[in-house]
UniProtKB/Swiss-Prot annotation:
It is found in: Secreted. Residues 23-49 form a propeptide. Veratridine increases the rate of dissociation in a dose-dependent manner. Transmembrane segments: none annotated. This is Delta-conotoxin TxVIA. Pfam families: Conotoxin. Disulfide bonds join C53-C68, C60-C72, C67-C77. It comes from Conus textile (Cloth-of-gold cone).
Length: 78
C-alpha cells in the first residue's frame, strides 16, 4: 500500500515538474503580443486585416460560422 502511494505521488510530482519546466521554444504569448503591437503601429503590414471568412456562395463550416456577412446554411454561405 505504501509503495502504491509513493508511486502515485512520484508520478504526480514528475507530471507537475514536466509542465512547470516545459520550454516554450516559440515564446508563444510574448511573441504573439509583440507581433500584435507591431501590427497596430503598421496596419498596412497587418495580417489581422486579412479576412479569414468566406464570401457568399462559398463553402463554409457549420461549427465555426465562418461566413463574412450571412450565415452558413447547408455548408454554403448565404
Amino acid at each position: 500500500m505504501k509503495l502504491t502511494c509513493m508511486m502515485i505521488v512520484a508520478v504526480l510530482f514528475l507530471t507537475a515538474w514536466t509542465f512547470a519546466t516545459a520550454d516554450d521554444s516559440g515564446n508563444g504569448l510574448e511573441n504573439l503580443f509583440s507581433n500584435a503591437h507591431h501590427q497596430m503601429k503598421n496596419p498596412e503590414a497587418s495580417k489581422l486585416n486579412k479576412r479569414w471568412c468566406k464570401q457568399s456562395g462559398e463553402m463554409c463550416n457549420l461549427l465555426d460560422q465562418n461566413c463574412c456577412d450571412g450565415y452558413c446554411i447547408v455548408l454554403v454561405c448565404t
